[in-house]
Amino acid sequence: MSNLVRPEKRDVSSAGIEGDFPLDVGVVEALPEGSQVLSANNYGSSAWTVTARLNVLLPNGLEKKFFIKIATGEPGHVMMRGEFNAMSALYRTCPGFIPKPLTWGKFKEAPETYFFLLDFVNMTNDLPDPVQFCAKLADLHRSSESPTGMFGFHVPTCHGRFAQDVAWDPSWPNFFTKLLRAALVIENKECSPWPEFETIAERTMSHVIPRLLGALEENGRKLKPSLIHGVLWEGNIGTDLSNGNVYVFDSGAYYAHHEMELAMWRCERHKIKSREYKRQYLRNMAVSEPAEEFDDRNRLYCVKANVIHSAHHPGSIVRETAYNDMCYLVDKYAPYPHGEEPSRSKVQGEVPATIWQGGDSHARSAHAFNIEATPTLSA
């Protein structure tokens, strides 16, 4: 759990606002001009942010609900700015797939407190319809265009509470190396020392990535930067209770190789591991060539997600999983001389070496993110 500090509780009843959420004037001023806040209530549960639902009377006389997330300090600043920009980019590309972002900003009466405001959608947390969900996701990947023609994003985005290195780069292998290296630096600070882990990670970055990802642009092939959600597991997907429309939220988006989106579908910790999701996605979006190395690329991409999960949850088994996956890839693409290879972890990975069925966790574990209690947008 983060050290998030809730904004100071203020008496809002005098302003005619019902509810238990301490509404800051900065939030009120961010709403459409002439709006009146009728109620503000804490809503949902989150490991890294405080969340609430606002009921607002618009100038045209209609009532509208908004969802708000807040976080404190410089990490909160980066999270709220990053998520607003990520969700805005997704919304511009596929508006029927994203709750509409409104704005982000800073509280005026609470120190170093930041917020992100978006449309409220009343959603169920049931697994989404695979056909609709995967068709929309593939459309996002196909139709998005990087504004620079490069991989990356114009502001840092976050995976959980940690910022990602998403600086623009024309090379996907170089971009992914920097993305993974930044994740490893964070993980090293949060977890106990493990020299063998650091050694195999360095060889993965120096030898495996150039070989495995470099092959994507061999023989005249060109890799398109696609906008990805970046943190896509079932906890960040919901279905509108009123019409069955599938939405995604809590994004850490950037422009990437589209297969990167499937990294978090690999492990056993989440229900989206179901083969049906991978099958439906690949009916809409082709695997990149060389197709025979698709599973190895997915394993590599999953290493990044597992490293960040380990940073959020020191001592988690996924650190061992990431280590064994890197050992597997090094053995296949950049083997050590006989007798010099590091030993495997005795803790086995979550998926057999011969198959993958999807799903990885977000930075929040199930016990830290009470999905059952949050049937709509959550942090």
Residue ranges, per PLM feature:
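Juxta-kinase regulatory segment immediately upstream of eukaryotic protein kinase catalytic domains
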Residues: S2-A40
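An alpha-helical support segment within catalytic cores of ATP-dependent transferases
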Residues: L23-L31, K106-E109, E145-H229, D240-N243, ...
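Short, surface-exposed acidic
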Residues: E33-S39, W194-I200, A286-D295
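ATP-binding pocket architecture of kinase catalytic cores
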Residues: N41-N174, K178
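ATP/Mg2+ or Mg2+-diphosphate-binding catalytic cores
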Residues: H309-A379
